[in-house]
């Protein structure tokens, strides 16, 4: 969900590529310290927080004479999302490559991935409700993604469990299923939605 990523994440922020320098791998920032993005409408590097831009999510952009006020070294920059693509689409992480490590058949991995994508994008929820987002932009409908996930102590207590949780929540972001209709499990103990939802089912007197 590229619109979700651009609106609510830093996927479009530019990351400097300048191997051998202290700035390599850091976000590109302007003189005021604000992160920068590449605007496809104007073909310029601008404040990433602007709401009137169409930020590039992929590509590589030269920085010399391009980043206004940027005090870092010359070089090039890519959107953070590009780095994610480069890693996730690497052949080392293909279903066939990881099947043996995970103990899950490659065809089953593909099937589950297809089911997640189908539910999120082919069965999206559309509610005709007007609302205003964090940047003051007004919308005439709410889009929901009927895909929800839950991670708590069971995963985080395992070795490398934090990275497992990170992968789960990155997947939620890629699908645009965070803080939207369909993105919450019914009566989960945590994370709690805002505003709070029904109390979790437990003892008989706690069930509503």
Regions from the language model: what does each represent?
Residues 1-131, 136:
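Long, well-ordered, tryptophan-enriched scaffold segments
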Residues 128, 161-167, 183-187:
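Composition- and surface-driven signal marking solvent-exposed, interaction-prone regions
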């Amino acid at each position: 969900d590229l619109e979700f990523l651009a609106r609510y994440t830093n996927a479009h922020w530019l990351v400097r590529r300048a191997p051998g320098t202290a700035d390599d791998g850091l976000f590109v920032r302007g003189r005021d310290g604000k992160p920068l993005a590449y605007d496809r409408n104007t073909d310029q590097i601008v404040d990433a927080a602007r709401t009137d831009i169409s930020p590039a999510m992929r590509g590589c952009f030269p920085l010399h004479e391009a980043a206004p006020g940027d005090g870092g070294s010359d070089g090039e920059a890519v959107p953070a999302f590009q780095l994610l693509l480069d890693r996730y689409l690497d052949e080392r992480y293909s279903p066939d490559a990881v099947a043996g490590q995970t103990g899950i058949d490659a065809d089953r991995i593909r099937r589950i991935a297809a089911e997640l994508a189908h539910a999120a994008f082919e069965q999206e929820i559309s509610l005709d409700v007007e609302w205003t987002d964090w940047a003051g932009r007004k919308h005439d409908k709410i889009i929901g993604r009927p895909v929800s996930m839950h991670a708590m102590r069971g995963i985080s207590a395992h070795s490398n469990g934090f990275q497992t949780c990170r992968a789960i929540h990155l997947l939620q972001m890629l699908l645009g299923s965070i803080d939207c209709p369909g993105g919450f499990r019914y009566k989960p103990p945590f994370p709690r939605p805002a505003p709070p939802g029904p109390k979790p089912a437990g003892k008989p007197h706690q069930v509503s």
